[in-house]
Amino acid sequence: MRRTVKDFRNAKGQRLVYLTAYDYPTARLAEAAGVDAILVGDSLGMVVLGYPSTVPVTLEEMLHHTKAARRGAPETFLVADLPYLAYATLDRALLAAERLLKEGGADAVKLEGGEEVAEIVRGLVRAGVPVLGHVGLTPQTASQLGGYKLQGRRPEEAERILKGALALEEAGAYGVVLEMVPARLAKEVTERLSVHTVGIGAGPHTDAQVLVFHDVVGLYGDFKPRFVKRYLEAGRLIQEALSRYAQEVREGVFPGEEHSF
């Protein structure tokens, strides 16, 4: 049975599993594996669409992939990212969230930022939209943070992240993602918040963990961040299978009699 926002609000201290999925087959596999929540992240821009960052991802693209993921995982709680600038104002955020929830079938939306987006979060929650916050490394604005690197090393950075997480909770977010922050900071934030935290590159002390599907299964062999654990080398196995197929076609081995009518 699909979890509800209330379940996640009461999930503090539980070891929850989030996983990204961007289409019907990956969402179907994630649901079959029993994950607690699927995140249709704007990371799809990089791992599915080949963009250099998440910035070019549009609302229409997010909607397209959210619909597909929902069809693949009808019984799993599904969170969809609000893409870059889709929540620059509350009106824009409400329109984007409306489409992702009503048309896309998402159960909640995620947006990046701390204190600076707290009022947007408050307005969304007031309108009945469940919101997952996101602090630390925020990929949509990574260039302002010096690139894709660890955040919160310096005391002032750590304070900003903690204050941001607390502001998101106070605004009504049902949980907060902590990305690429020191484990000790993630532990402190997790202990200070009453809502659950979701870590990615944030150590073992968060309430939940999230990883990108393609990283977990090793679809891209040349990309492995330090915080990723690969459970399969799918990219290599798939490439080997496709090479064998091509070879057998060229050699006249496939199709054989057993593949013919």
Swiss-Prot record:
Signal sequence, start to end: none
UniProt cofactor note: Binds 1 Mg(2+) ion per subunit.
Keywords, alphabetical: Cytoplasm, Magnesium, Metal-binding, Pantothenate biosynthesis, Transferase
Reaction(s) catalysed by this chain's protein: 3-methyl-2-oxobutanoate + (6R)-5,10-methylene-5,6,7,8-tetrahydrofolate + H2O = 2-dehydropantoate + (6S)-5,6,7,8-tetrahydrofolate
Domain of life: Bacteria
Subunit structure: Homodecamer; pentamer of dimers.
Protein name from the UniProt record: 3-methyl-2-oxobutanoate hydroxymethyltransferase
Organism: Thermus thermophilus (strain ATCC BAA-163 / DSM 7039 / HB27)
